[in-house]
């Protein structure tokens, strides 16, 4: 589809934006190979870092029509409650995808503990569920 997709990981201590690049981490490389387009803020030519750690004020770079977010990962940051504070923050509420109601939480185990074929299929399932328009 002709949309930009933003993706962010919310942990108990920071934000992480895994960049779209030829050297992207597993699930984000699958997005790239599936033709999912990311906004300019979330792209890299592969020569620099593969990850940004923006402050709350810098989240305005997440200009995607659709926003996927991951809470935590291998740690127990889901229980910190920080993501609930972030989702209620006016800066988050101003993001285009949030305003449009196109925000989807995806499973941290699938996206951050990526472990091969099963995880790859789950990422593809998430793409189909959240990005590909229905009939």
What function would you assign to each model-found segment?
Residues 43-48, 81:
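Short, flexible loop segments at the rims of nucleotide/cofactor-binding pockets, characterized by
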Residues 54-63:
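Short helices/loops that flank or line small-molecule/ion binding pockets
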Residues 1-40:
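Basic- and aromatic-lined ligand-binding clefts that recognize polyanionic substrates
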Residues 15-18, 46-49, 110-117:
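Second-shell loop/turn segments in exported
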Residues 26-30, 55, 123, 127:
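Stable alpha-helical elements in mature extracytoplasmic
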């Amino acid at each position: 589809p002709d949309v930009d997709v933003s993706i962010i990981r919310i942990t108990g201590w920071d934000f992480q934006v895994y960049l779209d690049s030829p050297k992207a981490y597993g699930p984000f490389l699958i997005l790239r190979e599936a033709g999912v387009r990311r906004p300019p803020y979330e792209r890299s030519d592969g020569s620099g870092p593969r990850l940004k750690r923006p402050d709350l004020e810098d989240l305005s770079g997440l200009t995607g029509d659709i926003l996927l977010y991951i809470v935590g990962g291998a740690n127990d940051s889901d229980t910190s409650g920080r993501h609930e504070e972030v989702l209620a923050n006016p800066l988050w509420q101003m993001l285009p995808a949030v305003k449009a109601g196109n925000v989807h939480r995806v499973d941290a185990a699938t996206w951050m503990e990526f472990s091969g074929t099963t995880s790859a299929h789950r990422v593809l399932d998430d793409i189909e569920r959240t990005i590909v328009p229905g009939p």
